[in-house]
Amino acid sequence: IIFFISSAVFKTSSISSTLRLSRSSISLPPRDTLQSMACDAIVMRHPIEGAAAYAAKVADPVIINAGDGAHAHPSQGFLDMFTIREQGKNLKGLKMAIIGDILYSRVARTNIAAWTKMGAEVHVAGPMTLLPHDIASLGVTVHKRVEEAIEGADVIDILRIQLERQQKGLFPSPREYARIFGINENRLKLAKPDVTVLHPGPMNRGLEISWEVGYCDNAAIRTEVQNGVAVRMALLFLTLTGGKHIENVD
């Protein structure tokens, strides 16, 4: 497991996944080269887009992308879809709202690609400074007001706001962001009564999500964390075995 940028939750989930599959796990510093590692699989997170694809070309082990810059976070996409399906919802035809910092979010790009492919209607909202200039080309509907994006939504995916974005002047202040784009109890009432609330974590309570929403009955945030272990176990199993003998797994 190689993390060029830190992520306590994902790293713990990945290590737990390997141990539950009766496999050993070692966390290696970036200075060790890919070619020198005698291992079956490498779980890698890197700040540069395309790093995992490059690693797959130069290294023999299976490469599992744990996030490469703002490009993709595949396992988060799988566990989000699993969490939604676990609640009995078929993604086709659902209204999905993604709110927040989409420009720098690998989770947003992954879920947009996955959800549109599964036939969902994806709506996005956030500060214009935190939306990609070509966001509409991804097959989503862009809203200036968060209320329009979440109205009648089946799923709301709330993205974490990194405070360094405010230091760069990409939004006025945390208080102003919470006032205009934060998901609180009043705004949540605009969505469907059985709306599923997702968040990749960790939450900035009182900023992009209120305390009440973060712990309401509709919030599946802790379920996402729990499902992360199971989904990553499945990914490791499938990639390491090629899916062979999967019928023998209880």
Regions found by a protein language model. Give the residues of each.
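Rossmann-like adenosine-cofactor binding region
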Residues: 135-211
